[in-house]
């Protein structure tokens, strides 16, 4: 990867004059000078205990391994909707993707193999060490994927308008400040860049399936992984996204079958869902798209098969 890829700074940030940085960048820096964070200490403790188990396909993260069967094509196909590039072997060549809360790199690796230049960040150092160790066995991944220990708000202070896409998969239900989190995602994206989120709706059915069944009865997820009060509906999430300058382009329901350990697209978002939003181009912005094509206005919702809409 490019040696100039941003890495989160561990030293105090020097705030340069607003005339040099721009109003939005200065706003972000002022925000975090007040020690605002999206990292929840309690959530850190949960995942610290599991940091060595990311690559056990039959272990605690088995559901995330199988989720790649849906989320990787979803990300790939939505990005390629607006791209005129054709590279059969590496369809995401030329795309710069930030994977927030990357854990052990379960999503970074397949995106890197598709040709994307991927930066995976996680506030837990143990997760990053696990990701780097697994990456080290594949020369292709060492070129395509870079990992660093930091939170999204730290990246936002030094990587304004850097990425074509930001991915937050099974992350937003664990953050302490969703509004700040989405604002930081907007900050690091190029104009017309894509934000991909997979998460859990806050419904009685999601409580029954994601907590009672998955955590306590079937034990396919460690007990205490989720808190129902932190789940968020697509409508609530869209409100946050709209206020941060995003346009929601697709919302698709997903369902996990614990008996077979597999995921499928379904026609409603009552439990899990995947969302694609695009950062609106502001007046004076240069398009961040590599091809200059205008972004489509058609939105797909709760599709049983997203490829029908893509």
Can you name each region flagged by the protein language model?
Residues 66-93:
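Conserved alpha-helix/loop element of class I SAM-dependent methyltransferases that forms part
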Residues 206-216:
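Short, flexible, mixed-charge acidic loops at enzyme active sites
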Residues 199, 218-236:
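Acceptor-substrate binding/catalytic loop of class I
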Residues 20-61, 65, 69, 310:
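N-terminal, positively charged/glycine-rich alpha-helical extensions of SAM-dependent methyltransferases
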Residues 262-310:
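Core SAM-dependent methyltransferase catalytic element
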Residues 229-245, 251:
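Short alpha-helix
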Residues 1-15:
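N-terminal chloroplast transit peptides
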């Amino acid at each position: 990867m490019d040696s100039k890829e941003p890495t989160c700074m561990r030293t105090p940030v020097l705030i340069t004059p607003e005339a040099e940085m721009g109003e939005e960048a200065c706003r972000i820096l002022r925000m975090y000078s007040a020690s605002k964070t999206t990292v929840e200490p309690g959530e850190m403790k949960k995942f610290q205990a599991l940091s060595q188990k990311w690559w056990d396909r039959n272990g605690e993260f088995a559901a995330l391994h199988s989720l790649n069967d849906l989320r990787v094509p979803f990300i790939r196909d939505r990005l390629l909707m607006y791209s005129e590039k054709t590279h059969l072997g590496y369809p995401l060549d030329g795309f710069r993707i930030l994977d927030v809360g990357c854990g052990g790199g379960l999503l970074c690796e397949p995106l890197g193999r598709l040709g994307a230049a991927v930066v995976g960040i996680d506030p837990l150092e143990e997760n990053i060490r696990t990701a780097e160790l697994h990456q080290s066995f594949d020369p292709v991944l060492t070129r395509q994927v870079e990992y660093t220990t930091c939170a999204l708000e730290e990246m936002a202070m030094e990587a304004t308008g850097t990425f074509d896409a930001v991915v937050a998969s099974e992350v937003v239900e664990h953050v302490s400040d969703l509004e700040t989190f989405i604002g930081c995602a907007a900050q690091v994206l190029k104009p017309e860049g894509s934000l991909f989120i997979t998460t859990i709706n806050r419904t009685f059915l999601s409580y029954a399936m994601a907590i009672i069944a998955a955590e306590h009865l079937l034990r396919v997820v460690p007990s205490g992984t989720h808190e129902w009060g932190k789940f968020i509906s697509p409508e609530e999430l869209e409100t946050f996204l709209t206020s941060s300058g995003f346009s929601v382009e697709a919302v698709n329901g997903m369902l996990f079958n614990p008996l077979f350990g597999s995921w499928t697209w379904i026609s409603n978002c009552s439990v899990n869902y995947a969302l694609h939003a695009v950062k609106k181009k502001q007046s004076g912005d240069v398009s961040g798209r590599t091809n200059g094509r205008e972004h489509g206005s058609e939105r797909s919702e709760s599709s049983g098969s997203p490829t029908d809409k893509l």
